Structures are given as C-alpha cells and as structure tokens.
Amino acid sequence: MDLTTLRAVLAELRPLLVPARFEKAQQPNPHTLQLGLRGLSGMRWLEISWLAAAPRLLAIDPPPKQGDGSTLARVLQHGLGGLALVAIEQEGFERVVDLHFAPRPGEASGRRLVVELMGRHSNVFLLDAQGRVVSLARQVREQQSRLRPIASGSSYGRPPALQSDPPSLEESQEHWRRRLQLVPVSLRQALQQTYQGISPALALQLVDGAPEPAAELLAQPVGTLSQEHWDHLWARWQRWLHDLEQERFGWEVDDSRSGSGGSSQYRCWGTASSGPVNAPLAAYYRQRLGQGELQRRRASLELKLLAAREREERLRQQQQDLLDQVESGDDLSRQADALLCLAAPSRDQVAEAQALYRRARRLRRSVVSITPRLELHQRQLDRLDASLAFLALHGPELSHGLHHDGDLEEALCQLQALEQESEELLARVGTEGRRSGRRAPPRSAPASTPSPLELLTPGGLRVQVGRNHRQNEWISLRQARRGDLWFHAQECPGSHVMLKASAAEAADADLQLAADLAAHFSRARHNGRVPVLKVPCDQLQRIAGAAAGTVTHKGGEVVWASPQRAAHWLAAAESVPKVPAEPGP
C-alpha cells in the first residue's frame, strides 16, 4: 500500500469511523490485526497488517471469530476497552497513521495506535498517554536496528524523516524539471530520489499514456527525454497533486497491462469518476493473498508427496533386488549338484553342497513374503502418482484465473480436500509394510459431500469430473446409475469422468467431449492424442481392500481423445448447479 492508496483509504474511512467505539480486537494470523469499531452507521471492522509483502490498513467485511486469544489482541482488548476512536491522523507523505482513542469525543487522547506501513519495517504500536509503548506487533532489537530499537516499555520515536522533498503544487514546471535533471540517472530514480511519496507503482502511473511503454520510459536517462515527454509527465504530476489535495479518488483496474511493463494493476487517482476505494481494494488484497496462500500450500504438498514417493520407490527397489536374487537359487543348486557329482567328494565339499542347497531353498521360500511387499509398495506408488497427478492437473486452476471470491473459496476447498487425502495417504505409507502386526491409522470421516466438477455437454447431459480420490469413488460407484458411462485415460493416473447418459441418450459429440475431458484431466494432458477407456458404469467394480477411487472394469472400448480440444471447451463452459445426491445403483 503506497502513500496515494493510503490517503484514498483514510479519506473514505474518516467519515465512517470517527467517532466509533472500540469493541473487539482479534489476530487471525501472526501478521494481521482486526479491530471491531461501532459507529453511528453500525459495526465496522478495520484490518491492519504488517506483512512485509502486503502491509495495509483498510475496512473489511465482518470476519469470522478467530485469534482473540493472542497476546496482542488481549492487550488491545484491555487497553482500548471503553474508549472511542476520535481521530485518524496521517502527516505529509509519511506512511504512518495515528489512531487516537479517548473516553469520548472532544476529550484528550488516552491511547494511540500507531500503524507504520513501510514494507519489511512495518509495525503496529499501542502507546499510552505519555507516548510509551504498551505493546507492539513485533519487537525491534538493537541487532535489527541500531538507529531505532523499540520494545515494550520504551518511549516511541517516529521513523527517520524522509531525505527527499515533499511535492508541492506551488512549484513551477521549470524548477520541477531542473530538479529532476540535476543528476544523470534514469527517470524512475530521479522521481523516487527527488520527491517523497513516489512508489514504483505511482511512477508507472505518472508516465502512463506516453507513446512509449511506461517501463521503457522510466528506464531512460532524464537527459534523453523530449519536450513532449516532459509536458506529458508534468500534466500527470499536476493531476496527481490536485487529486491528493482535494481527496478526489476513485478505482480503476487494468488487467490487460498488469505485469507487462505498463501501469500497476489498479489505481485510485486520475480516474474518470470518483468513487469508493476501500471495498475494491480489500477484494484486491483478498484475491492476491489468497492466490499466494494457494501456491504456497500447493508447493508444500507437492514436496511432501515427492519425498514420500522417493522413499517408497527406494523401498520397492529393495524388495525388487531381493526378488531378483531368487533367480540365483538355481545357480546355487547347480553348484551343489556339481559338488555332489564328484567321484569322491570330501566331507567339506558335502557340507558346502548342503549349505548351497539351504541357501537356494531360503531364496525360493522368500518369494512368498517378498511378492506381497512388492505389490504393496507398487500400490502405494500408484496412489502417490495419482495424488501428484491431481495436484498437477488442478494446479493451474488453483493458482490462476481466480477473479471472484467464489472461485477462490472453491479452489481452497479443492486444495484442502487434496491435503486431507494426502495426509491419510502419507500416514498409510509410513505405517503399512513395516510390521505385519501394525495396523494403518483409520481413515478420518469425510466432513462434507464431495463436490466434483460438474459441466453440461452441448447435448444438455451432465458430466462429472473427479478432482481427488474421494470424488472419483463418489461419482463412479455411489452416484452412478445404470446407463451412465465411465471414462478414464488408459494406463495413466487421472480423473474419473462420468457422463450421465442415464438421463437421455448421449450423442456422439457428448461422448467425444467426455473422452476429451478424461484425457485433459490426466497425466497425459500434454499429448496430442490420448487413448481413453469408455466403460458402462454397471461394469465397474470396487477392488476389495483397495483405497478409495480404485476400481476395476470388465469390457469397455478405447476412444481416442484430444486434451487440447477439452481445454478450449472448458474455457467457455459454465458449471451447473449442484444437485442432491442420488443413491447408487
């Protein structure tokens, strides 16, 4: 959150929150604080975060109750209880906000909550009337900052003053240009080193609309800019300063140019019309932080599964090596036969032959115990490969293209389901096969009804796509009715696809689409053509003792499918509403 965005948020919050009585404090995570304030228009929540990647102060929708037992939340609950927010101050171009609390409006401030939004140096301080630190979000020790160490009980000192000068509407264009050209550096460096409040995002916005791409123009030395460039930049500079002075803010998003060297993805000044900033900004942070959390959790789960697969492959190879040694039993028997076929074998030769026979018998008997262990490790490898395939298939869906809160919540639910299944699988991998007498941990009861991907074919038939092992079993064995068709990529981990042909006769286009979806949601999705099995659901059978989502089939036929064709179709498809669960056949 840069200075311009902070000014826009505070201009919107002051009439809503001043005055407002403090009621609740909670800390949902280690870097975020949420305050409940009751004003004239009702209860409102303020979120303050000192996360280095996304420090922010803004109003949010009522959050769930969580984190009210943290130390910082308890101190704030005790220190601000019975007080009202009477002022919100922010001076100059500093990203420091003072929230003043007093027993009632018009009285002297008894407590101050100071919010510093400065990247990795962001922090939150609760101060008493004398300016001493009662509590703070994170301690700043001398090893971290010799200039400004702060701890509970010490006197609060403001951050060091900014070295550059504050922008001013009274400055002339000639003086402004001369200052920027004083040192032969790039335009970006000149703006940020000469004036306060110029963030990288604001620098991009100031040069937006020039003939050259914004990033290229900012990288040019100031001495090479033309008069046209300076006139355009001066006009944008004046518009920015006027909007700041008059608190004329709005919200605009330009997704087409984000991350491509153009302006930042959103702006809150220079917009076509004025409007609220806080609500869309809160949604923006919610989406970006949610996507980051999804990517981190997905990467962590992938590392766990890969480590478990490597360990399981090593154990399987050990059993395979033991099984390969069984073939040497025949050689041992022949060596023993050769010793006993001597004309006059000695006692030592007879003893050696008997030892060779015993070794050969032990090797042959070991097949009975090695083979089940080898099969067990192979089943575990297949399960791990399937889990990795699910994670890879739905990774792009979990990480990108989430433009609405519903999309983000759905992605979180799908990832959580994969995490729960993987935890059970990893626990089973760590216990099965070590001791025959040890039992695997019981499977946890599912918390809710599975929610597979549901789509409508061009012919109006429903098609269900399992996105984890539990969903695969649910659509293939529990929800399937006589007449439904099951699709799965041949000899390849992936999703079960069920075409609900029991409702109506499936056209050729519907059958081809279901096959394409099965190819797309498989590990062979990058191939040009994929063989897909098409089997009537009444020919599916659960494998006794196997894990969820493991089936065998009789008959069926192979259909050639195109994963790319399914990908193009999915881009325009819409999910159908959920329907009540139907009893299995």
Where on the chain are the PLM-derived regions?
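Extended, highly charged segments
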Residues: 1-585
